[in-house]
Amino acid sequence: MKRVTTRSLEGGPEVANVSEEGAGVLQSSAGAQAASDSKAESTPHAALPDKPLVTIEPSRTWVALNLRDLWAYRELFYFLTWRDVKVRYKQTLLGAAWAILQPVCSMIIFTLIFGRLAGIPTDGIPYPIFAYAGLLPWLFFSNAVTNSGNSLVGSSHLITKVYFPRMLIPGAAVAAGLVEFGIAFTVLIGLMLYYHVGLTLNLLMLPALVLMTTLLAIGVGMWMSALNVKYRDVRFALPFIIQLWFFSSPIIYPSSFLKKWQALLILNPMAGIIEGFRSALFGKAFNWTALGVSALVILIVLVYSAYSFRRMEKSFADVI
């Protein structure tokens, strides 16, 4: 028999008589426990399984626009669009009424200056509705380009924290402009009723013209937004570019007013769209050549903008 002395929880010694075999078991058990504790301390993470490292980054080629990825984030697109609509009229007294006041006030000013004082011909169309029909697609385009051009910089907190297709941000800014376009279109319906403008089959072209305007706004806005991330001068130059584009488009005058400049005017994609709007609303003959050139220019702008955006997208989170 061996005498084994142990220490109780209260700190006092306890003496117990055990056999030699029992003492050996106690010693071996204590040694195994000490070895186990030592091994656990030396390798604390040995029991954790290795996990693969997943890196999420944009594609290296612009061809892989990954429409499936864009479709997977469609709910985020709806959220961003609705956010832009709410933020645009947040803390305003008139709210969405500004979507109507802006084109209406512009129409009144243009009617007084260019319609009454300058006497610009309008091909037999009353100047107020002539000007409003040109302002409607133009204001949608210009506001969409301006808002989408600043959209990436304004959403820097999202870009630096969460992965999602960056194209959704400028696209949502353009989609929010469609809401304003729909509100302002109600005034055009009232003007058509007031001036007794008859309905023709040309109105069936309106959805196609709205689509062309939307695609052009997405192309230009997407390119400007990507440039604005790297070169912040874009936000100062963009209003000036929009202003020059306004006067080079047949908004306050018909395209027939610039007979000597028709070859250059037709290269402006908004010229074909605006004249197409008037032809659809007033039952005039379409200038299919101008519409065809506008469609071709829009396609070129859209493809080039997508290429530039995909190429610069990889550095957005680093420089924004």
Which role fits each region the language model picked out?
Residues 2-320:
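Hydrophobic transmembrane alpha-helices and immediately adjacent juxtamembrane helices
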